[in-house]
C-alpha cells in the first residue's frame, strides 16, 4: 500500500464543566465528547525518502505549526522511520470553532501513517503521542464517543443515541487561551460521575463568558434556539442543536443567517476512521 485516504471527524461537547484550576495553570474538566460523521479528509502518499510535505485546500494553513505536520514528524522521530509522505488536507471544518478539527487531523495523521509506514504501534502509544500535541488528540485516536475528565485526556467510552445535529459557526474566531485565562470564567462546577450523567444538568461553563466577549455567538444562539434547544461546543464559536430528523434540521439550515456557516451531521459512537482503516486490510 502506497496511498491512503482517511476522514478526520468533528466532535461536539454536549456539556463542558470546569471543576477547578490545576497548579500547572491548566483546568480540570468534565465533558461529554460526541463524535460526528462529518469532518475533514486527508490523503496520504508514501515516499521512499524522509521528506514530509503538506498541501491544503486552504493554503494559509500550511506552516510549521500545523498539527498534521507536527504529528507526522513526531511519529517519524519516535520510531526512527526512514520513510516520508505527501499529505493533502481537504479542510472542511471551520478553524477555531470548537469542533476539534486540528486535533482530529493530527489523530488521523498518526493513525494513517502508522498504517502506511507499517509501524505497528498500539493505540495506547499513538494516544500518548497525540496527547503531547493537544488534549483532544487522544479522543480522536481512540475514536469513540466518550465521557472525559482531567484536561480531557481521561476517556471512558459511552454509547449515546445517534442524533441529527445542526452545527452553526458565526464569523468569528474565539481565542481559547483568552477564555481559559479570563478571571470571570466559571471554575467551580461540582463534579459528576458517569452514573449521574443522565440525571445531571448539562451546560457549558465557557458559554456565558464567550457570549459576553463575542456578542455574535450570543446572537447566533438566539437564532438557533428558535428551532431547538441550543448551546455552544468547546470554547466556541460553533453552536449546535439536536433535531428529531434530517428534514427538520434542513428546514432550520435553509434559514441560516448569511454571516454564518452551517452543516448537518449525525452523531456516531465510533469514528468512521476505523471503518476506513478496516477497508484497507
What are the language-model segments listed below?
Residues 34-35, 131-132, 139-141, 157-161, ...:
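Solvent-exposed alpha-helices and their adjacent loops that cap or buttress functional pockets
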Residues 48-61, 109, 131, 195-203:
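Short, basic/glycine-rich phosphate-binding loops at helix/coil junctions
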Residues 33-36, 130, 224, 256:
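Hydrophobic C-terminal alpha-helix "anchor/cap" residues
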Residues 142, 146-229, 242-281:
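Conserved, helical-rich catalytic subdomain that frames metal- and/or nucleotide-binding sites
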Residues 14, 42-44, 68, 102, ...:
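Residue-level signal for inorganic ion chemistry
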Residues 1-96, 115, 119-124, 151, ...:
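ATP-binding N-lobe of GHMP and related small-molecule kinases
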Residues 88-117, 229-243:
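Glycine/serine-rich anion-binding loops at beta->alpha junctions
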Residues 84, 110-147:
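Contiguous, small/hydrophobic- and glycine-enriched helical/loop subdomains that border
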